[in-house]
Design a protein with these regions (language model features):
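Cytosolic regulatory regions built on CNB/CRP/Popeye-like sensor folds
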Residues: 1-183
């Protein structure tokens, strides 16, 4: 086998094609995808490699192409608490959008993972200039945030379910009075 056929077999898609084909960005227009490509770099992570750490500066976001990433919380616990596992087609790292730009979770590759990384500083500038880009990203990232919040909520309830009292938090709730009738 000569070197030309080897290069053909392992040919990698151009970054612009990878951005355009990522499911998270489906339906975005050509101009928006071009701006996103301008902010993007390809990244690869080994199994068990920490990608980002909770509490550190959020400098961008990731779109997973292959592999799996565990999102974990370390805040207030002796060990990391798994929140959610994301894989191909998913986004993680939405904290770049909102001051103070601090990661809300730790992300760790569970297996070898390829992702597109988008630099926040450049992207925020583009979003300020092109509000349609900012709005498209906000709509998509908001949906991810809701899912992530629900996953964190469910996980915390699961962890603390044995400690949660089934009794009301206040021993005697105040009674509402309507005339002489107590409701």
């Amino acid at each position: 086998m000569n070197s030309q056929s080897i290069n053909h077999e392992i040919q990698i898609e151009p970054l612009s094609t990878r951005v355009m084909l990522h499911p998270f960005l489906a339906g975005m227009n050509h101009t928006q995808l071009t701006l996103l490509t301008d902010c993007a770099v390809a990244r690869h992570f080994n199994a068990n490699q920490t990608i980002l750490r909770e509490g550190e500066f959020a400098n961008g976001f990731y779109l997973v192409e292959t592999g799996k990433v565990a999102l974990e919380s370390e805040a207030g616990f002796d060990e990391s608490i798994p929140i959610q596992i994301v894989g191909a087609g998913d986004l993680f790292g939405w904290s770049w959008m909102f001051p103070p730009y601090v990661w809300q979770f730790t992300a760790r590759a569970i297996e070898p993972t390829s992702a597109l990384f988008f630099y926040a500083a450049i992207l925020r500038e583009y979003c300020e200039k092109d509000h349609s880009l900012g709005y498209e990203l906000l709509k998509r990232i908001s949906a991810v945030m809701v899912t992530r919040l629900q996953a964190a909520h469910d996980q915390m309830l699961s962890i603390h379910s044995s400690r949660i009292s089934r009794e009301p938090l206040i021993a005697e709730a105040p009674l509402l009075k309507t005339g002489n009738v107590r409701v």
